[in-house]
Curated annotation (Swiss-Prot):
GO biological process: tRNA methylation; tRNA wobble uridine modification
Required cofactor names: FAD
Coiled coil start-end: none
Subunit structure: Homodimer. Heterotetramer of two MnmE and two MnmG subunits.
Functional note: NAD-binding protein involved in the addition of a carboxymethylaminomethyl (cmnm) group at the wobble position (U34) of certain tRNAs, forming tRNA-cmnm(5)s(2)U34.
Protein name: tRNA uridine 5-carboxymethylaminomethyl modification enzyme MnmG
């Protein structure tokens, strides 16, 4: 077949999954093509103008630790930074940034355009070109008839795949923010034989900043103390003139307006067919499901420094536009607000993720990968994490190297992908800290310690990032060694000093590390007794030291659990396993095994509906092989 051009990797879709996938493949040396419907929407934020949040912020740190771009890009373009859950334990702390929406997209587009081995091109991909046996992808075809050869293809089409926007009774074919909908590719995936689902998400109205009465709202400032998503970012560059968000609430009048128009709500009238997100429901869904609540929180989030648009977080809706006008004016601070864009719902096709391997390669077609909302997830961060993994694995496949799979104990990205390919999802999947059984290990502060060496091994972490990481870890090791050797002795002046600080006396000599294990003690207080280190210890190293020492016992227990799970993961299941030969397992287990085809005993044990007895039978069978 004649191709216009040939590439190692072709990525379809330039959203948050697509840019990470294409950058990863190109940086690993693969000749890569990124095809996007609209060059002006590369890394565009069609919904909330923010990056991070609970669990999601840790994903961004993981992307950065592996050599990805999202963390670096938001650190260049944020307008506010805030650490969440600071009053809770380190396992659930996460960073959130308010983004300058346009700057974020422009900056990422420039990064993509400047990347060696990467070509950015506008076009609508209509068809995957397969080999004669229809088992391997060899290229793509666009709406203009142009064909490009590819050794691997990654689909990252987001909500554009047969996308339809819904506002009241109005329903029309569209991708996010009135971009083109991808119909041909959606049809093609069905023709190939993929099981396709239909999901829904939504976005709230935007209002004019100058029309808001901020005196009726509560200011939500950013943090003065520096924090960053990228491990490479410097505290010296931390933004001082941050832009605040504002908190307001729905009112009883808001709820009356909504209840009086529920018969016109697409969600309840039958116009919306797709399954919506459980953890980000529309406001009409919220007042129905939580009818006892007198009000709901709303956050007024500026979309950038050079725009008047303000996003009303928490007010996602697809109600008719006239209802939205009344709804907005029922909210304190927005009585005279001008609505610039109405909220809308968008329905789109998804490739049901049980059809994927842990590499995000499809089981049906060799060399074809999918990532992001195409796989049934929600959120920019979840998409970017999957895009990175798909891009790495596409490059490795082309290069004939071993595949890259993140374990549940290594990263939230690993938890997410394992959930998707093992359990599947019947609704838009969102990462939560509660989904991770090893969350004390998967923290914000140690993402580089967990993943940078892995990123270096696959060829994605640059020399500069690697040197920075090694210097940090060397300092961490030196200071940990010092804390474990320097001692506090039960001398009179020590006891007096402890009393003045509100600490109880010590009976025996303690190392600095032993003293730091006390829950009320922090690193700086330990230094008061054992003295300063001979070098200036970086703030991020101190944070890591405090957590590792304070929670040492809990971390050890978690690592013991990880070791047990790794033993199960080490037991591989043959690719062409005949599940009918396992006579003694339950019928439900056999059906699930046939559908998902788990690759390890560990993955099999996590499938919903499979009980320990089924796993024991499978283990005995495998040991007898």
């Amino acid at each position: 077949m004649n191709f216009q051009e040939n590439y190692d990797v072709v990525v379809i879709g330039g959203g948050h999954a697509g840019v990470e996938a294409s950058l990863a493949a190109a940086r690993m040396g693969s000749k890569t093509l990124l095809m996007t419907i609209n060059l002006n929407m590369v890394a565009f934020m069609p919904c909330n103008p923010s990056i991070g949040g609970s669990a999601k912020g840790i994903v961004v740190r993981e992307i950065d630790a592996l050599g990805g771009e999202m963390g670096r890009n938001i650190d260049k373009t944020y307008i506010q930074m805030k650490m969440l859950n600071t009053g809770k334990g380190p396992a659930v702390r996460a960073l959130r940034a308010q983004a300058d929406k346009d700057e974020y997209a422009d900056s990422m587009k420039n990064t993509v355009s400047d990347q060696e081995n990467l070509t950015l091109r506008q076009g609508m991909v209509e068809e995957l070109i397969l080999d004669e046996e229809k088992k391997k992808v060899i290229g793509i075809k666009t709406s203009t008839g142009t064909k490009y050869g590819a050794k691997a293809v990654i689909i990252t089409t987001g909500t554009a795949l047969r996308g339809e926007i819904i506002i009241g009774e109005l329903k029309y074919s569209s991708g996010p923010n009135n971009s083109l909908s991808s119909i041909g590719l959606a049809d093609n995936l069905r023709e190939i034989g993929f099981e396709i689902g239909r999901f829904k998400t939504g976005t709230p109205p935007r209002v004019l900043a100058s029309s808001i009465d901020y005196d009726k709202t509560e200011i939500q400032p950013g943090d003065e103390a520096p924090n960053h998503f990228s491990f490479m970012s410097s505290d010296e560059n931390y933004l001082k003139d941050q832009i605040p968000c504002w908190l307001t609430y729905t009112t009883e009048n808001s709820h009356t307006i909504l209840r009086g128009n529920l018969h016109r709500a697409p969600l309840f009238s039958g116009i919306v067919k797709g399954v919506g997100p459980r953890y980000c429901p529309s406001i009409e869904d919220k007042i129905t499901r939580f009818a006892d609540k007198p009000r709901h929180q709303l956050f007024l989030e500026p979309e950038g420094r050079n725009t008047e648009e303000v996003y009303i977080g928490g007010l996602s809706t697809s109600m008719p536009e006239d209802v939205q006008f009344d709804l907005v004016k029922s909210i304190p601070g927005l009585e005279n607000a001008q609505m610039m864009r109405p909220g809308y719902a968008i329905e789109y096709d998804v490739v049901m993720p049980h059809q994927l391997r842990p590499t995000l390669e499809t089981k049906l077609v060799s060399g074809l990968f999918t990532a992001g909302q195409t796989n049934g997830t929600s959120g920019y961060e979840e998409a970017a994490g999957q895009g990175l993994v798909a891009g790495i694995n596409a490059a490795l496949k082309v290069q004939g190297k071993s595949e890259f799979i993140l374990k549940r104990s290594e990263a939230y990205i690993g938890v997410m992908i394992d959930d998707l390919v093992t359990k599947g999802t019947l609704e838009p999947y969102r990462l939560l800290t509660s989904r991770a059984e090893y969350r004390l290990i998967l923290r914000h502060d140690n993402a580089d310690r967990r993943l940078t060496e892995i990123g270096r091994q696959v060829g994605l972490v640059s020399d500069e990032q690697w040197e920075h990481y090694q210097a940090k870890m060397a300092q961490f090791d030196r200071e940990m060694k010092r804390l474990n050797s320097e001692k506090l002795k039960p001398l009179p002046d020590t006891q007096e000093k402890l009393g003045k600080l509100g600490f109880g006396p010590i009976k025996d000599a303690l190392t600095g590390a032993e003293f730091l294990k006390r829950p009320e003690v922090h690193y700086n207080e330990v230094i008061d007794f054992i003295g300063q280190a001979p070098e200036k210890i970086d703030r991020t190293v101190i944070e890591l030291i405090e957590t590792e020492i304070t929670y040492e016992g809990y971390i050890k227990k978690a690592m013991d659990q990880v070791d047990k799970m790794h033993r199960l993961e080490a037991k591989r299941i043959p690719k062409n396993m005949d599940w009918d030969k396992l006579d003694s397992i339950a019928t439900e287990a056999r059906q699930k095994f046939k559908k998902i085809n788990p690759e390890t005993l560990g993955q099999a044990s996590r499938i919903s509906g499979v009980n320990p007895a089924d796993i024991s039978i499978l283990m005995v069978y495998l040991e007898g092989k």
